[in-house]
Amino acid sequence: MGATPRSNCRVVDKFRLPPISRFTAILLAISIGLAAIGMGGWWWLQRSSPLHFQAEQLHEPAAARFLPRNANLSFYLQLDPNQLPAYGRAVARSKQRNSAANALTQLRNGLFATAGLNYNNELSNWIGPELAIALTASSNNQIQPSWVLALSSRTANGAREFLQTFWQTRSLAGGDLSISSYRGLGLISSSNPEAPLATALINDQLVLITSSRDALEDALDSSQVDALNQSSDPQLQNWLKQNRKGVALLRSDATGISQLLGLPAKLVAEEQMQQLVGSIAVQGSELQLAAQISTGIDRNDPPLGDRANQWLQQLRHSADQINISNANSSLNSLLTVAVTKPGPLLNELQRQNQGPLLLALINSNQWLAATDVANPSPEALNQPLHLAGFDPTSINSMDVWSRLSGQTNRAGELKAILAGASASKANVRWWSNNFDELQNQLQTKGVNKKAPFIDAKSVAFSQLGPKLSRDLLGHWSFWQGLQLLAAQPLSPAVNGLEYMLEEDKTSLDLKATLHFS
């Protein structure tokens, strides 16, 4: 037999890359290394810059497990308190950077001081980017609310070392301490009747400080039952599932809204406010609040739609206040306009209007309004205004209602008292109690590119200028408290406020923006 031919076992790899030189390999390694360093450096700069606050994604707070669900007001902060002054300096105008940083420093330090804590000496070197506080109001208004404060640690031993120093300092000051165990945790409390504080350490990473030992035991009891703590609160969970961005979470019930946040009890009762959950975000020098308020009212106001934005874009004036809402809206208690003397035209316009109405307050005595072009028609106002003593006439395609005063001007002509005037332009009917203001509006060309944008689903909108915003905040007890903590007035920095409302069955969705200069 002939010899069997040997098989060719050599495999030829058609896709083998050509060999690279050592120099090329070194260059490639250096390039990859530099790219990695660059990406890491970019990430580090983004995280270390206070401006990263603007892009933060909210997440479920670890402290939620230890905050009782029956607390009337809860606030979660998810940012590094040490960076607050730097953020204020970064977004403020050049001449106001120091004052902005100082205001945030004082406000931060003042907030911790209310709990008996010195931020610079006791907290700044270890406190982490998560903290929370829950407040429970007393049935006796003369008694301060009980509270639970939760502080995260950014270092391995910072929380434990803080507690040692915290109680050592207070023990040396003459306070008697009680050390015990509760639910497997070591509890330390003070017998000082003026400051009966209590503390516990959770896994070396979370410090609980409470206004009393009872409040601490209540918090620890709640942590063992999902139905009693906020970690499993469906309203809070549903809010977080919507991928909200921000630096803070807010949760409150009706008592917290009226007694602790300081909204008028009459307003809370009229709107039947029951629960509030929301988040706070920062964008430049703006503070943005998004919230959902559960109420006991079945709401069915129609959305404003695109016409609200069209009206705002056509509006020429820089008004002290602008409101847009539907006729007979259930939200009118939230949208009052401070017209000193509304006059018969505005009163009748508001009575007869059946659709949305834009009302701009030019100053305390002058107003400008917009409605759909034929709702109501000027003719529908003739009879009631005639009964009020004002007769209709037409001047340059404008409907005017006026009456003679019986007084004469320098030329000997009788003076006229104006109730107001109206004219249409671009499918919008404009109204005003000032003839010149209406003429100026009709002569406006183009659109206002700085006009705020309203979501199409919104049922109401309000915008306040600097003065009215400061006046409104100045009468709010919660704002007054913040100014006391900051040890300086905060209102002068306020540059405006706007908010819009949407409805969903028995709840209100609120979006508000507070502008700072």
Where are these regions (language model features)?
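A short acidic, often aromatic-flanked loop/helix-cap motif at beta-alpha or helix-coil junctions
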Residues: 83-84, 257-258, 408-412, 467-470
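Leucine-rich, highly hydrophobic segment in Treponema pallidum outer-membrane-associated proteins
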Residues: 14-46, 54-63, 202-203, 211, ...
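Single conserved position on a long alpha-helix in the C-terminal lobe of the eukaryotic protein kinase
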Residues: 75, 121-236, 352-456
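N-terminal intrinsically disordered, acidic low-complexity segments at the extreme N-terminus
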Residues: 1-12
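Aromatic/basic-lined ligand-recognition segments
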Residues: 273-277, 347, 409-417
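Alpha-helix boundary/N-cap detector
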Residues: 99-102, 114, 231, 340, ...
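Structural boundary/hinge residues at secondary-structure and domain interfaces
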Residues: 18-25, 35-174, 184, 262-267, ...
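Surface-exposed polar/charged interaction patches
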Residues: 93-97, 110-117, 129, 169, ...
